[in-house]
């Protein structure tokens, strides 16, 4: 929180006194969020590993995870009061190793990790809160797991992905964690996002989405 307040003050000075371009201001605000997310992820991972051990893939390799940013964060367009839209992704199914008392599947481990990251960022303290976190853009929204494996996430978009989810993925980017895993996801999801052909149902969904946007915008 102190880090965020310090740098938001610096950005505010650049914005108001030095009259820097809007693109530079929103980019700097987004960078502060990226660093804050990385620090929160590392702290949460340390806490979880001390309790449950280190998550591993079924191959025996240590598991990797990445936080993906959507919307204004993904597009490096955050303003001073923006929520941050996030999705948590890990590389493969498996379980924790290193603690005899309690072994967790990677599903359970990363769900707890997400909860801890959100707590660190959004709990009110004497210094306020760092960020309001929104996880609703993840597959299945509030009904879905807090974190998914790469394979499960790709399977969801391939079979159940909606038009609005395709649009949301246009601005997504890795913001913390294993950037290479995030880039692997971006490459794999590209055929879904930039589909060459649309079926009738998808075209109708686009038309319906356009009508909803126009209705909300008013006359």
Residue map of PLM features:
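A nucleotide- and high-energy phosphate-metabolite-utilizing enzyme signature
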Residues: 1-219
């Amino acid at each position: 929180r102190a880090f965020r307040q310090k740098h938001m003050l610096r950005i505010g000075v650049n914005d108001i006194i030095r009259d820097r371009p809007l693109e530079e201001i929103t980019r700097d605000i987004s960078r502060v969020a990226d660093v804050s997310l990385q620090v929160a992820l590392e702290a949460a991972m340390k806490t979880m590993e001390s309790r449950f051990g280190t998550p591993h893939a079924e191959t025996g390799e240590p598991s990797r995870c990445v936080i993906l940013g959507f919307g204004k964060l993904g597009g490096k367009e955050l303003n001073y009061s923006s929520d941050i839209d996030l999705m948590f992704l890990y590389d493969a199914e498996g379980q924790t190793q290193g603690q005899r008392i309690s072994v967790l599947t990677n599903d359970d481990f990363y769900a707890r990790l997400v909860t801890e990251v959100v707590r660190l960022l959004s709990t009110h303290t004497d210094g306020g809160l760092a960020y309001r976190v929104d996880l609703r853009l993840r597959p299945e929204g509030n009904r879905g797991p807090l974190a998914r494996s790469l394979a499960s996430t790709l399977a969801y978009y391939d079979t159940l992905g909606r038009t609005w989810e395709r649009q949301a993925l246009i601005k997504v980017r890795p913001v913390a964690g294993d950037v290479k895993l995030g880039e692997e996801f971006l490459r794999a999801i590209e055929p879904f996002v930039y589909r060459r052909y649309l079926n009738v149902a998808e075209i109708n969904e686009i038309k319906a989405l356009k009508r909803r946007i126009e209705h909300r915008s008013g006359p």
